[in-house]
């Protein structure tokens, strides 16, 4: 599970600038699909070896009377569910009544709140930030979000205390010698655990109905088992002699009250469920078609590398010409996830619901399919023979060998000379070649390219990202103790 960082502050203090810097395009090929709409307020950040969910609470505003209680419900919910709140203020504008109003609201939330003075570039940050100590929220962290100044130190200072609570927050180091062994251990752990299935979708697409239909078909005794993912409920179940854990984000709490259950939608809770799941079942409303919110959720699923099954709900009762038009639109807008199975269902009447688990099982099997080094290297050689890599700086790129780097999603690591200079088009070609050769269905594939270091280039030892972060923390602590 990843921690949630909420960016709070009045308008024009730099929340969006910091958000954009933290959620810059990631290197993972699974996110490199045309036609993908990315949400502007919720994102997955991978910054300087730290990964987390970041929320831009744009609905927060303040005035002389204090906090505006009519602020957006999603913004309030995001603050309530956040692990860290970064309260941004404008160092150039100084302390305002709106800042004081927001601070008064945040003090009541019992959250880890850090004051962040933005726009300190070109001014005396210490003197211009002094007034913000009056907010009564502790030290003032100085940054220039537009240029990235102080951002790494800020994240290290605010997120490192959570490292034990969120072990997945730190991106693993590239220890290539043990990578294959670690991948094998990860696979063994996955295969020994139940399949975690998250049913996600925007409000009122039928997630609650589908959850209840699935549980009703299984005829099992269902009880509330609180999970670790905020308010999501983890429901154990069995199907076809296979254990599952259904991650319920729809707000359903007890079987006896499902008829009057009101669906509660939380974007943060949905993102946490996606991170926790092995397979994500995305529910789309057939009558509304594919919306930008659906595409945003798809973006989070792809960035997380989770297996994917798409269910188009409310299919019963539609005329044939309407169904044909919907299918054409789905083909056009969802062409970038051609690896995912698409099902047309009616959660209310149970039509085709039973077939969903065939695709869930197929997707999970693809995501956890054991792949050895010799097979991957052979496929890599075949791909090179069919379509040679390009010439870079007068030398043809040479891929030497490939091995497994992880599962769920399958990660394939290719080693060679100048492989990092390969154009994106060739990287996509390699990804698609591996997908077809391995007959992978229902899961994205991530391909990483590594270059061997020249042992004669330098005699100095290079620090890892983890060592650099620890060094910065020690230097900061030493500076504060002076």
Curated annotation (Swiss-Prot):
Ranges for domain KH-like: 369-453
GO molecular function, one term: ribosome binding
Chain positions recorded as GTP 1 binding sites: 9-16, 56-60, 118-121
Gene3D superfamilies listed in its UniProt record: 3.30.300.20, P-loop containing nucleotide triphosphate hydrolases
Recorded superkingdom: Bacteria
Sequence ranges assigned to domain EngA-type G in this UniProt record: 3-166, 195-368
GO BP annotation list: ribosome biogenesis
Pfam families (UniProt xref): KH_dom-like, MMR_HSR1
SUPFAM superfamilies found in the cross-reference section: P-loop containing nucleoside triphosphate hydrolases
Binding site for GTP 2: 201-208, 248-252, 313-316
Keywords: GTP-binding, Nucleotide-binding, Repeat, Ribosome biogenesis
InterPro entries according to UniProt: AAA+_ATPase, G_ENGA, GTP-bd, GTPase_Der, KH_dom-like, KH_dom-like_a/b, P-loop_NTPase, Small_GTP-bd
PANTHER family in the record: GTPASE DER
Function noted in UniProt: GTPase that plays an essential role in the late steps of ribosome biogenesis.
Recorded family membership: Belongs to the TRAFAC class TrmE-Era-EngA-EngB-Septin-like GTPase superfamily. EngA (Der) GTPase family.
Subunit relationships: Associates with the 50S ribosomal subunit.
Protein name in UniProt: GTPase Der
Source organism: Pseudoalteromonas atlantica (strain T6c / ATCC BAA-1087)
Gene: der
């Amino acid at each position: 599970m990843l921690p949630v960082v909420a960016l709070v502050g009045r308008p024009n203090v730099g929340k969006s600038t910091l958000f954009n810097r933290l959620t810059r395009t990631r290197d993972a090929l699974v996110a490199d699909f045309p036609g993908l709409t990315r949400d502007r307020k919720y994102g997955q950040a991978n910054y300087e070896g730290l990964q987390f969910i970041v929320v831009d609470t744009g609905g927060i505003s303040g005035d002389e009377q204090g906090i505006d209680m009519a602020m957006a419900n999603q913004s309030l919910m995001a603050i309530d569910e956040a692990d860290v709140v970064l309260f941004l203020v404008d160092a150039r504008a100084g302390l305002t009544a709106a800042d004081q109003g927001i601070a008064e609201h945040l003090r009541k939330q019992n959250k880890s709140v850090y004051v962040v003075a933005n726009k300190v570039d070109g001014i005396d940050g210490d003197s211009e930030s002094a007034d913000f100590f009056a907010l009564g929220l502790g030290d003032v962290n100085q940054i220039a979000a537009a240029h990235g100044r102080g951002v790494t130190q800020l994240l290290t200072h605010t997120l490192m205390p959570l490292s034990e609570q969120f072990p997945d927050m730190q991106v693993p180091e590239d220890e290539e010698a043990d990578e294959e062994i670690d991948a094998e251990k990860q696979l063994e752990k996955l295969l020994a655990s139940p399949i975690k299935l998250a049913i996600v979708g925007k409000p009122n697409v039928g997630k609650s109905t589908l959850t209840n239909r699935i549980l009703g078909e299984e005829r099992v005794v269902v009880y509330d088992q609180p999970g670790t993912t905020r308010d999501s409920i983890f429901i154990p179940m069995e199907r076809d002699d296979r254990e599952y854990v259904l991650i319920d984000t729809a707000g359903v709490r007890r079987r006896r009250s499902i008829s009057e259950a009101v669906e509660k939608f939380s974007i943060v809770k949905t993102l946490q469920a996606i991170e926790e799941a092995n397979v994500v079942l995305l529910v789309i409303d057939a009558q509304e078609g594919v919306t930008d919110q659906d595409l945003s959720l798809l973006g989070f699923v792809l960035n997380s590398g989770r297996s994917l099954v798409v269910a188009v709900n409310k299919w019963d009762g539609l005329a044939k010409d309407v169904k044909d038009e919907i299918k054409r639109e789905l083909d056009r807008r969802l062409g970038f996830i051609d690896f995912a199975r698409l099902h047309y269902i009616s959660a209310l009447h149970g039509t085709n619901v039973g077939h969903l688990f065939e695709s869930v099982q197929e997707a999970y099997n693809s995501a956890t399919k054991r792949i050895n080094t010799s097979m991957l290297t052979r496929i890599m050689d075949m791909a090179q023979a069919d379509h040679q890599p390009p010439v870079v700086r007068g030398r043809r790129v040479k891929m030497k060998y490939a091995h497994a780097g992880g599962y769920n999603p399958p990660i394939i690591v290719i080693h060679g000379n100048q492989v990092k200079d390969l154009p994106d088009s060739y990287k996509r070609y390699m990804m698609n070649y591996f997908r077809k050769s391995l007959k992978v269905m229902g899961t994205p594939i991530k391909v990483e390219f590594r270059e061997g270091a020249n042992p004669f280039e330098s005699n100095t030892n290079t620090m890892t990202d983890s060592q650099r972060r620890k060094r910065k923390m020690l230097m900061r602590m030493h500076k504060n103790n002076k």
